[in-house]
């Protein structure tokens, strides 16, 4: 049996600064794939903890890591890359992720161009609209993680 290889990764479900009064999440459109909306995420570097990677990735991708950590998904969750994009991370079949639910402290600190841009646009959307916007191959993972945070009373 062939074992799949997954890239270790962190992902952030970022609630707006108005949370818990409003339940809107941050999504961003990838700069390299028009129409590909997702949560901020990124690889965990050698010797880095998932929490350290989360703070670094948020600073790199959205220009701020001023967040309050609300919760963490209790285990790693994986998805496979679609066959048409496997070349991007040729050594991996997909990614295994550690999800964090966080609240952004100040929305006006978001700067997609602070570092090398990975996103072209962002928006805060209501949870009910989330899965319609997200790239199809990530929907099952998003559905599972969101369901967990709902069961735990965060969403």
Curated annotation (Swiss-Prot):
Top EC class of this enzyme: hydrolase
Enzyme Commission numbers on file: 3.6.1.-
Recorded GO CC terms: cytoplasm
GO biological process terms on file: mRNA catabolic process
Molecular function as annotated in GO: mRNA 5'-diphosphatase activity
Domain Nudix hydrolase: 5-147
Short name of one Pfam family: NUDIX
Family matches, as CDD domains: NUDIX_Ap4A_hydrolase_plant_like (cd03671)
Key words, A-Z: Hydrolase
Motif Nudix box boundaries: 42-63
Classification via InterPro entries: Nudix_hydrolase, NUDIX_hydrolase-like_dom_sf, NUDIX_hydrolase_CS, NUDIX_hydrolase_dom, RppH
Cofactors, names only: a divalent metal cation
Family listed: Belongs to the Nudix hydrolase family. RppH subfamily.
Free-text function comment from the UniProt entry: Accelerates the degradation of transcripts by removing pyrophosphate from the 5'-end of triphosphorylated RNA, leading to a more labile monophosphorylated state that can stimulate subsequent ribonuclease cleavage.
Stored NCBIfam families: PRK00714.1-3, PRK00714.1-5
Name of the molecule in the record: RNA pyrophosphohydrolase
Gene source species: Helicobacter pylori (strain HPAG1)
Lineage summary: Bacteria, Pseudomonadati, Campylobacterota, Epsilonproteobacteria, Campylobacterales
